């Protein structure tokens, strides 16, 4: 799977399904579930490393975990899901040259075929444009952008008319810059629908309703492994309680033997 294949999916009205992964096991499970895209998201800072936000994640962390995820893929290369890696905080907000260097390290050091960049501010636009010119495919991300939570919080975006117009403008800009797809996070469903209708590249929604060209979820949220669930992700099982109870049963039985 290549970034350009996602555009074909949109052209054919074929839904794109994506999950996050953070190690070999989660990567293998995602591949076996037949997802189209696996995102090594900076959410692994919280899911896997125990941080309270995505901000402490380093370039070295994301490279390490991307390689672990890719080792979980067992299908033929052409049949594997598209592997996309988040650029961590301050690896692309530090100027074009450094951003190219850091994104280049991700692509060179892992099997990722694209990077994801949050935001569409003028400085970020320059970075995205430069990365794409250098041959590095970029997935955009607008709406709720977790790396900006110190300024914007983690609240739903696009609630005001002004905010909606900005998000629509940002989406158009990202398409013109050459992004192959855009993540739309935690925004009104009708806003996401309008953006989806106006773009020729696919939109991947998370907390943005059902009209996007695809859906992505943090796997740990979907499996109910976290104590704090985002309001837009309903777990399909209560995994943490299930695993805890089963492990406790085993511990108790072993103590009796």
From Swiss-Prot:
Its EC number is 2.1.2.11. It comes from the Bacteria. SUPFAM superfamilies: Phosphoenolpyruvate/pyruvate domain. Homodecamer; pentamer of dimers. It catalyses: 3-methyl-2-oxobutanoate + (6R)-5,10-methylene-5,6,7,8-tetrahydrofolate + H2O = 2-dehydropantoate + (6S)-5,6,7,8-tetrahydrofolate. Its cofactor is Mg(2+). It comes from Prochlorococcus marinus (strain MIT 9312). GO terms for cellular component: cytoplasm. One of its GO terms (molecular function) is magnesium ion binding. GO terms for biological process: pantothenate biosynthetic process. Catalyzes the reversible reaction in which hydroxymethyl group from 5,10-methylenetetrahydrofolate is transferred onto alpha-ketoisovalerate to form ketopantoate. The keyword Transferase applies. Pfam families: Pantoate_transf. This is 3-methyl-2-oxobutanoate hydroxymethyltransferase. Gene3D superfamilies: Phosphoenolpyruvate-binding domains. Belongs to the PanB family. The active site is at residue 185. Pathway: Cofactor biosynthesis; (R)-pantothenate biosynthesis; (R)-pantoate from 3-methyl-2-oxobutanoate: step 1/2.
